[in-house]
Amino acid sequence: MRQLEHYIDVGQKRLRCGYTTGTCAAAAAHAASCKLLNGQAPDVVMIETPAGIDAVIEIEEEGCGKDWASCGVRKDGGDDPDITDGMLVVARVSYVDEPGVVIDGGEGVGRVTREGLDQPVGAAAINSVPRQMVTSEVEAIAHDCDYDGGLRVEISIPAGAELAKRTFNPRLGIEGGLSVLGTSGIVKPMSEDALIASVQLELRQRHAEGAKDILLCPGNYGWDFARDELALDLKRGVQCSNYLGAALDYACQLGFSSILFVAHIGKMVKVAAGVMNTHSRVADARLETMAAHAALCGASRELVAQVMASITTDEAIMHLKEAGLLKETMASIMEAVAKQLRHRVGEGLQIEAVTFSKEHGLLGKTAGADRLIALHATG
């Protein structure tokens, strides 16, 4: 298995990145399309990832029939401690009558059984960015081979059903296998010490550049919302991953004047409960917290039970919205967020928060958030 030679340096550590399952699926689909359309699969495939990093991936196995071809690659997780490292990801490409590229999941790829996830109920748990990557690779090969007919791509993970039992997929409403994931195409190492150190490094850099007011987001969802929906300048921003508490503590040490925290509701509702490391292995409490605040706002026992039984925060929001209690519940949650954040940072700086969901948009702000939004606005 050819390894990705892309590293990130954190302090004295040099950590190697890996590929997402989405990148593996795209590479396998690329090779299988070559095998089907011109009779020869390449030994290696180069994929340009959304992160702008070229991934050169070995093709480990291949097969073919009269109207189909398949190829597989092994996932390279880099220095990330991931149960999917080394697993085989296979793409089977076949001819279909309908034009375009149709993508589905086969053995070991989960099926969506509940609403509120990236894909609709009944679809294979292959998220949007991997689908785009697979489609792009297959269309490029079809174009090179002067083929303008339809193609079906089935992604399978032979070990996926067993590995999925060790993930949160069953609880999330994804049954029968793993999800094919990735927004950047690259897996960055998840060493906790290294991640916290990298967050601290970015905070030091912003401080050294003269920034007094800092924007914090857990990851890409918050980053994109801050830029696209709030029109914020990200130059004074730092992604803190799940380590909000560590980021706040260090920001206080550096002496920033204010912090604006922008996060998806799935992260923010944990903060309302005082959870400052939002990784799922540390704590959850999302639905319990939403249910408690709904009850404080007058929710019926039935509605509280619906919130508690939800699979995702978006599903819980839907129930609150239908009951006409979303606005009051979010105001209560954001008041709790404000108290938790101010307790963590003390009186030395102003801290405010904004939360949202991809499905419902802006959901809530703390009382002084608009002032900090104006400070970070572009233009």
Q: What do these predicted regions represent?
A:
Residues 129, 312-316, 366:
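Secondary-structure junction/capping motif
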Residues 1-166, 170-172, 368:
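Generic N-terminal targeting/processing segments that precede catalytic cores or assembly contacts
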Residues 114, 164, 225, 270-272, ...:
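Generic domain-boundary/flexible-linker signal
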Residues 350-379:
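Short, amphipathic C-terminal "tail helix"
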